[in-house]
Regions:
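Active-site-proximal acidic secondary-structure segment that organizes catalysis
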Residues: 1-9
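A general secondary-structure junction signal
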Residues: 8, 49-53, 114-118, 171
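Short amphipathic alpha-helices and their capping loops
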Residues: 9-63, 145
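Short acidic (Asp/Glu) and glycine-rich catalytic loops that position anionic groups and cofactors
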Residues: 10-15, 130-136
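Gly/Ser/Thr-rich phosphate-binding loops and adjoining beta-strand/alpha-helix segments
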Residues: 26-29, 54-121, 132-134, 141, ...
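Helical lid/core segments from catalytic subdomains that handle acyl or acyl-like groups
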Residues: 35-43, 83-84, 131-171
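Short glycine/proline-enriched loop/turn "hinge" motifs that connect secondary-structure elements
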Residues: 124-130
């Protein structure tokens, strides 16, 4: 093997950087972004359980659900649909999930969480540590939207949320 290069930017360096970031305009911009979305949110995207889990009972309603295509389309069809609509397959499935959660919870808006690798600064490329960031993705469901328009809104939400990921999810 090759000799490993020493880290140029450690997990400790990242922590110090993030602490100093709180004093910047970029941090405030990210905080304002989340405030503008979530300050008036009154929806509840939590899936309510009907019954306590019981592994001995088959096909009993519980607090989970899964999306299934029943084999109705292929990976290639999803990829082609995404390309034709200038989105990613990830956006297709996140949009489907958000829509299903909205229907399941009888809400017109949802918030679900996703994660990113958290290594957007190129100095973190070879850093050892947990950089994963949890990001809340909010969606407003408008039944008048076409599927394409709805998914483009999801794509926009993802991009804006990732661009503002410096503001910690827990704050």
């Amino acid at each position: 093997g090759k000799e490993l290069e020493p880290e140029k930017f450690s997990q400790l360096d990242l922590s110090v950087f993030e602490e100093k970031l709180e004093e910047t305009e970029e941090y405030q911009k990210s905080k304002n972004y989340y405030d503008s979305i979530f300050s008036a949110v009154e929806s509840k995207s939590e899936i309510t359980e009907d019954f306590a889990e019981n592994s001995e009972v088959e096909d009993k309603p519980n607090g989970s659900f899964e999306l299934s295509t029943n084999g109705k389309f292929s990976v290639e069809e999803v990829r082609n649909f995404a390309l034709a609509n200038q989105i990613t397959p990830y956006t297709v499935f996140l949009g489907a999930y958000e829509y299903a959660v909205a229907k399941f919870t009888n809400q017109s808006e949802t918030t679900v969480c996703t994660v990113t690798h958290g290594r957007f600064d190129k100095r973190l490329k070879n850093t050892v540590g947990m950089m994963v960031r949890t990001l809340p993705i909010h969606a407003n469901i408008d039944e008048e939207d076409t599927v394409s328009d709805y998914l483009k809104k999801i794509r926009k939400n993802i991009k804006e949320t990732v661009a503002n990921d410096w503001f910690p999810f827990m704050k």
